[in-house]
Regions:
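Functionally critical transmembrane alpha-helices in membrane proteins and complexes, commonly lining
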Residues: 21-72, 90-98, 122, 129-136, ...
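Alpha-helical transmembrane segments of multi-pass integral membrane proteins
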Residues: 219, 223-224, 245-357
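Aromatic-anchored segments of alpha-helical transmembrane domains
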Residues: 35-42, 105, 133, 186-196, ...
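Transmembrane alpha-helical segments and their boundary/interface "anchor" motifs
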Residues: 71-108, 118-126, 154-163, 214, ...
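Interfacial loop-to-helix transition and helix-capping segments at the boundaries
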Residues: 20-24, 44-54, 117-126, 142-157, ...
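Specific transmembrane alpha-helix
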Residues: 53-71, 90, 155-169, 182-235, ...
Length: 402
């Protein structure tokens, strides 16, 4: 049995610690992910792997959420599921409401929606209630298909993960190895189901790409990496993941998932290979020397800012092309692309300043109020204080930004 509180020992100096510190490189990863998605959707999808950007978001989400829970447990020997859901709601919902409002206005004014000049109720509810992936797969008819809302499918997958994962960790956080092997089994089962869906049932590539039961492993691979860091195997695992051979193999595996165009491979094995290959890459971001080129690029001011804006950029980038499509006569005209990028960056920054920052402060106040009078201050100081010993290996979450 591995306790989440057993975080420090002399041979664990390279193992990332679950703490409340901020790590700019993770915003840099968000910047890479959203850039891949936007560039692909703005006309270069034939050479830029936009879908991999979503996979990056998934992996990062699994890692960060799991780290948050271990940090909370290390500080208070408890996990508050209620507070977690409240923080998630305050983080995700306000920008989503702005997106839905803007989509309604844009499509009503420009009359670009299919079959009408307003956003249909069905697709709006699907976005608000986080089931866009299934709505688009099974219920979305042509007259009800508003393209910008389709982007919410990945939010639905993450929300479904949030519904289950806090309860799993709260029940099993003192039995990390057991949880780890259970999640390995789930990842294997998800791959098996994709193979059955593709080769046995002949289901569409959209199903294996968007359905929660086909993509949740992309989030779980990130959670697995955090779970590995909480086991007694952690020092050996980190040493292995840092070896040049491991990193080269991981890079080649990722490259293979981009260049192999067989549709069966892309619908099934691709996601599993990417999840495994991301583990050495994320480890490099977490434990390498901060002066390394990778970490300096990811922690640069432009990358961090873009990462902080990434959620709103992701939501708005397709919608942002709408005015340009009307004015310039198509989605991939230079004017449409330039105006779309200017709009999405401006809107995302305004949402960040006017909505996301105030919501982040509210989340922190709620967190501090809930902890008032609880004897966790010293424990939290012990956890975050380990950053002096771990240096660049320290990793954690600020619930307002990370």
């Amino acid at each position: 049995m591995t306790s989440a509180r057993a975080l420090v020992s002399p041979d664990r100096e390279l193992v990332p610690v679950a703490s409340a510190g901020y790590v700019g490189e993770l915003d840099g990863i968000r910047a890479v992910a959203v850039s891949l998605v936007v560039v692909a959707h703005y006309g270069l999808g034939f050479i830029v792997p936009g879908a991999f950007g979503v996979t990056l978001f998934f992996f990062l989400s699994g890692y960060l959420i799991t780290t948050l829970f271990f940090a909370e447990y290390a500080a208070a020997t408890a996990i508050s599921v209620r507070r977690f859901y409240l923080r998630r709601w305050l983080r995700l919902t306000p920008p989503l409401l702005v997106f839905i409002l803007l989509a309604t206005v844009f499509h009503s004014v420009s009359r670009t929606s299919v079959g009408g000049d307003a956003v249909p109720v069905g697709t709006t509810l699907a976005a608000l209630l986080y089931y866009t992936n299934y709505y688009d797969l099974f219920w979305n008819i042509a007259a009800d298909k508003i393209i910008p809302f389709g982007i919410c499918w990945s939010l639905a997958v993450e929300e479904h993960f949030y519904l289950l994962w806090p309860w799993v960790l709260r029940a099993g956080i003192r039995h990390t190895r057991s949880v780890f092997w259970a999640i390995v089994a789930v990842c294997a089962a998800v791959l098996a189901w994709r193979l059955i869906a593709r080769y046995g049932l002949g289901l569409s590539s959209d199903y294996t790409y968007m359905a929660t039961e086909c993509r949740i492993d992309s989030i779980l691979y990130g959670a697995l990496l955090r779970l590995l860091f909480e086991t007694q195997w952690a020092p050996a695992v980190v040493r292995f993941l840092r070896t040049p051979t491991c990193r080269i193999v991981a890079g080649l595996l990722l490259l293979a998932t981009f260049v192999i165009r067989d549709e069966g491979f892309r619908q099934t094995v691709r996601y599993s290979i990417q999840g495994i290959a991301l583990m050495p890459i994320f480890t490099a971001v977490l434990v390498d020397d901060p002066r390394s080129l990778l970490r300096r690029v990811l922690s640069s001011a432009p990358a961090v800012l873009l990462g902080r804006l990434s959620y709103s950029i992701y939501l708005l980038h397709l919608l942002a092309r709408t005015p340009g499509e009307v004015v310039f006569g198509g989605p991939y005209r230079a004017g449409s692309i330039i105006s779309g990028l200017l709009f999405v960056l401006t809107a995302a920054y305004l949402i960040h300043v006017l909505i996301e920052r105030p919501m982040a402060r509210l989340r922190r106040r709620l967190h501090e109020h809930a902890d008032a009078g609880r004897p966790i201050g010293a424990a939290l100081s012990r956890v975050t204080g380990n950053q002096q010993a771990y240096g660049s290996a320290s990793i954690g979450i600020v619930t307002g930004d990370q």
